[in-house]
Amino acid sequence: MADGATIVGRVRKTPSVARRGSLRRWLRRKSNVGFLMCLPLIVLIAALVIYPTVYAIYLSMLNKNMTQFVGLSNYAFLLKRNTFQLVFFQSCFFAVSAVILKATLGFILAHLLHNISGGNQRIVRGMLLTPWVIPLALSTLGWQWLFDPSYSAFNWVLNAFGFASVPWLGERWIARLCVIGVNVWYGTPFFMIMYLAALKSVPEQLYEAATIDGANAMQKLFFVTLPMMRNIISITVLFSLIVTFADFDIVRILTAGGPQDMTHIFATYAFEVGILSGDIPLGASVSLFILPILSICAYFVLRGVTRRSKEIAA
């Protein structure tokens, strides 16, 4: 009888022991432990992102007085509106051109810095990072003074050499280029520091092997450097595209969407329609147009990164 009771007890204890053993094995994996440590932050970020998004979708389906459900009428109204079509074009033009310029200039600066050794690199790197560490609103105010038609420093220099003053923020294409230029000035250091870190991680043996094979500088760039940096380039471009599409400070401070709505982007137009004009549902509809654009971009970029990571692992 005693032996029978012992066997029964062991049988009863077996499932719990097995569960504890599987839990220990699960916790031994570093990735699982890391996930558990990040879980509180993930939950917090999800709450801060999901709730505003769902609430914005709800608001976008109400009428101006927020008393009646109108479905997708606000979106249909925006798509037929010439001003919004212009905003859509300007947002895409602003984001794509600014990101391309930032990525290109950041890559060039990273290469130049990579060839500087010792303490000089730290000094130059710190100087080039200055635009990125200054608060954006403050630095944009400085640019506004430089572009001001009454006391523009740029126009003073042009006048000193006998050229006429330029309406930097008064002509639509010049204003667009000025807005893009300020965004590029602010965001290029981010690309520079990311690409510099990526360049330092490229093994020197690859360059030595390419030299032995007779490769010149351009061949090393296209067949060694760029393939090794593809993932970091993709991630930085995606991140910058998201931030640039959502940019507000630069356009709002420099032009407030003018002249004649010619520099409005999604964020500033949503602010004008939703806050200044008092049509919050329509403003929410404007802001939500960014979501599908960025979702499509993120899908293709992350799919490419995942595919390349699997190829490297294989």
What are these regions (language model features)?
Residues 1-29:
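Short, Lys/Arg-rich, polar N-terminal cytosolic tail immediately upstream
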Residues 30-314:
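A structural signal for multi-pass alpha-helical bundles of membrane permease subunits
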